Regions:
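Arg/Lys-rich amphipathic alpha helix in sigma70-family domain 2
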Residues: 59-78
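A short pre-motif secondary-structure segment
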Residues: 111-112
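DNA-recognition helix of helix-turn-helix
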Residues: 128-153
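Sigma70-family region 2
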Residues: 35-52, 72
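Helix-turn-helix DNA-binding module
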Residues: 102, 106-107, 117-137
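Acidic, proline/glycine-rich intrinsically disordered inter-domain spacer in sigma factors
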Residues: 79-102
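A short, charge-rich alpha-helical start-of-domain segment used by transcription regulators
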Residues: 1-17, 27-30
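Short, small-hydrophobic-rich alpha-helical interface motif
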Residues: 15, 19, 29-40, 57-60, ...
Length: 158
């Protein structure tokens, strides 16, 4: 098994899981992960060495998801947005959580999703490309902010 194949087998499930949680669409998540792997493969073919492939791939995935979410938000029809706001109370819990995550800043969303996936503070710092010392405080503030958003959306937390 070559280096690319072993990296693919190791990283694909993690990348897909993060992308699916961020964009809330299985097909789009698969497309994003595929696009990242194509780009990574092209880098390898051109002789460019990625020293920490897992961190690089996960960072590329979260960045691509943020770009997609920005695009989707910018190009979403206004009627769909108003329907979303009007029907919040009837949404499934996952839909409400997804809406709450969408209200966070891109970096905040990345950190919450990585944390929920079980990544350590050190791994979150590497993937999000931030200082290790700021992860705990930023994550704490973000989780508090998320809790407030969920409360505003009448999300019942256990």
């Amino acid at each position: 098994m070559n280096s690319f194949e072993s990296t693919y087998r190791e990283c694909y499930p993690k990348m897909y899981g993060i992308a699916r949680k961020m964009v809330n669409d299985e097909d789009v998540a698969g497309d994003i992960v595929q696009e990242i792997f194509v780009y990574y493969f092209e880098k390898m073919q051109n002789g460019i060495v990625v020293h920490h492939p897992q961190s690089w791939l996960l960072r590329a995935t979260t960045n691509k998801c943020v770009d997609y979410l920005k695009y989707r938000k910018k190009h979403a029809p206004l009627s769909a947005a108003s329907e979303l706001a009007d029907e919040t109370e009837t949404f499934e819990p996952d839909m409400i959580l997804q809406q709450a995550l969408a209200e966070l800043k891109p970096m905040e969303m990345k950190m919450v999703i990585l944390y929920s996936e079980g990544y350590s503070y050190k791994e979150i710092a590497q993937i999000a490309d931030i200082n290790f010392s700021s992860v705990g405080k930023t994550l704490s503030r973000t989780l508090h902010k998320l809790k407030g958003i969920l409360k505003r959306l009448n999300y019942e937390m256990y």
